[in-house]
């Protein structure tokens, strides 16, 4: 008989939080018993999001009112610099899955440089597992604290890591061209700019300066046995709400064929359905 797990979601009314709740409600082993919010306590999620028929969900409560003894897992879907405050209070009291950037980077100084904010529990960074399931599956199974990867990094690491592990590509001139819908910027993004008839196009931003570069580099380097990895990262915003694609250009090492590449990805996909 499958186990049922009581699950809490803090920050359940943001874009990430609402999408997470949709996924969790379709999981046969999950019972959502707490939904946290910053500004909508006393309401139901269906009052905020009418894109899905939510059933049997608890009323929204203030994030700080969460009691970790009532749940088996807590997902924290709050912005960076806010999430770590909740983690500090909940650490060692419940299994934590954090969806912010607060625990993805191994080095606090790198975090501070990229996100421009202090960290209330930088000493806990070492206790978090980078939650890229297809790569770190066994580590995740044995960890009580998971840092969910960023959106751009996920789209980049999944294709590149298998190639690095097999030493199929040169590591000095990788070009990454990524495109994202504007939901990735969160609810505070100025949608009116995108919807303007004069701006119905996509555009690049933060070329080679995006804060996800450190996360991408950190995780790629863990699977690279030769020289330091050098890449350019060119992110773009598309004039649509959601979606992401990364096109990556690499130089193949000598004697690596198209079939070699396809076989690597087929094998990777076989074990990561």
Located regions from the model:
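N-terminal Rossmann-like NAD(P) cofactor-binding subdomain of oxidoreductases
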Residues: 2-207, 226
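Charged docking surfaces used in two-component/phosphorelay signaling
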Residues: 184-273
């Amino acid at each position: 008989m499958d186990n049922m797990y009581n699950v809490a979601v803090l920050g359940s009314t943001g874009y990430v939080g609402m999408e997470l709740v949709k996924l969790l409600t379709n999981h046969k082993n999950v019972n959502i018993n707490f939904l946290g919010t910053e500004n909508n306590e006393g309401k139901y999620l269906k009052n905020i999001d009418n894109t899905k028929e939510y059933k049997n969900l608890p009323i929204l409560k203030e994030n700080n009112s969460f009691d970790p003894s009532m749940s088996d897992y807590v997902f924290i879907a709050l912005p960076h610099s806010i999430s770590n405050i909740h983690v500090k209070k909940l650490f060692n009291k419940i299994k934590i899955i954090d969806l912010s950037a607060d625990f993805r980077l191994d080095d606090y100084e790198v975090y501070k440089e990229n996100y421009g904010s202090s960290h209330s529990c930088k000493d806990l960074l070492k206790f978090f597992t980078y939650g890229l399931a297809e790569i770190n599956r066994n580590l995740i199974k044995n960890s009580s604290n998971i840092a969910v990867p960023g959106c751009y990094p996920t789209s980049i690491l999944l294709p590149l890591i298998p190639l690095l592990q097999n030493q199929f590509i040169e590591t000095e001139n990788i070009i990454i061209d990524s495109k994202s819908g504007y939901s990735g910027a969160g609810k505070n993004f100025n949608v009116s700019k995108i919807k303007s008839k004069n701006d119905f196009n996509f555009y690049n931003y933060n070329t080679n300066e995006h804060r996800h570069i450190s996360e991408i580099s950190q995780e790629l380097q863990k699977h690279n046995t030769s020289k330091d990895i050098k890449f350019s990262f060119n992110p773009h915003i598309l004039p649509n709400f959601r979606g992401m694609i990364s096109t990556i250009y690499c130089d193949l090492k000598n004697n690596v064929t198209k079939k070699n590449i396809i076989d690597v990805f087929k094998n990777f996909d076989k074990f990561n359905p």
